[in-house]
Amino acid sequence: MINKTIPLFLIAGMLWSACQSNSKSIANSDSLEVQPQSETNSPGAGTEQETPLQTKGKIASAAEILARPQVPILCYHQIRNWTSSDGKVGKDYIVPTAEFKSQMKMLADSGFNTILPDQLYNYLAFGAKLPKKPIMLTFDDTKLDQWTVAVPELKKYGFKAVFFIMTVSLGRPNYLSKDQVKQMSDAGHVIGSHTYDHQNVKKYQGEDWVTQIEKPTKTLQDVTGKDIKYFAYPFGLWNKEAIPELKKRGFSSAFILAEKRDENDPLFTIRRIIASGYWNTKTLHNSIVKSF
C-alpha cells in the first residue's frame, strides 16, 4: 500500500522533478498549421462546438486510432511570475502571467479552436469531424492561479479547457475551492480527475484504487453534478495494469505526457506536452508543430 498522506510541498517537489517536459528540443519550423482530418467549419477562432460523448456504434481499432492525426494538447500547471525560491526545474512548470496571456492571444490570432475531451473522444473512437486547427488546453494540480489568471484569459478568447483536479487540495490556501471548480464546470470547462494527492499510479495496490480514484471521482461528481469521464496520470506515469482499473471505474480516456502512446490502448494514453515556463510564443508554436 502507498502512503496516503504527504505534505503538499512534497507533492510539488515530486511534480517538478518527475514530470517530463519537451522543452529542450524545439523545432525551428515557423508553420502554424496543425490540422487533423477535419472538415467542420468552426463558428469562430477560439470557440468549440458543444458535442456530447458518442456511445453507440463500433469503436475504431487501436490501429485506426493511432493512424488518425494527433490533436495538439497543451498541459499547464502554474500561471504566475517566477520568484527567487523557484528552482530551475520548477520554472519549467510555471508560466509567467504575461507570457501565458501572449500565448493565448497567439493561439486565437492564429485561428486555433479549442476542443473538449468528448469531441476528442468522438474523433478518435468514431472518426467524428473536428473544427479547423483544433487544440486542447489542460491544467493540472488545482492551483488557484488557474482561476484568477487562466479562466479570465480563456473567457476573453472564447476558449474552453480541461482542469484535472487533485482533490486533497480543494479549499486549501492557494488552491481552488469547490465553488470555483463548480463555476468552471458551469461555464463549460471540463473537470477531470488527477487523483487524491498525486501519487504515482504505477504503485497502486488494492485499496489505493478506492482512495486515489473512486473517492476523488465521487467528490468531483458531487461538486460539479456531472459524470467525471477523463483522467490525467500524475507525473504522466502509467502502466498497463492501470488501464483496466480506470475502465471499470467509468473513465472514457486518460492522458499522459509526451511519451509514446500505448499500441493497444491509445485512448488511455493520449499525449500532451507541458507548456514550459521557458517558452515564448514562437517556441510554443514550434513545439506544437514538432510534437504532434
Question: Where do the model's predicted regions map?
Answer:
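Sec-dependent signal peptide recognition
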Residues: 3-9
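Acidic (Asp/Glu)-rich catalytic clusters
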Residues: 151-159, 176-193
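C-terminal motif of bacterial Sec signal peptides marking the signal peptidase cleavage site
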Residues: 15-18
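Short beta-strand and adjacent tight-turn residues that come in two discontinuous sequence segments
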Residues: 164, 194, 254-256
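Substrate-binding clefts and substrate-entry loops adjacent to catalytic sites
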Residues: 192-205
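C-terminal active-site subregion of NodB/CE4 polysaccharide deacetylases
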Residues: 26-137, 144-145, 203-292
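Bacterial signal peptide processing site
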Residues: 20-22
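Residue-level marker for buried hydrophobic side chains located in beta-strands
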Residues: 137-138, 191
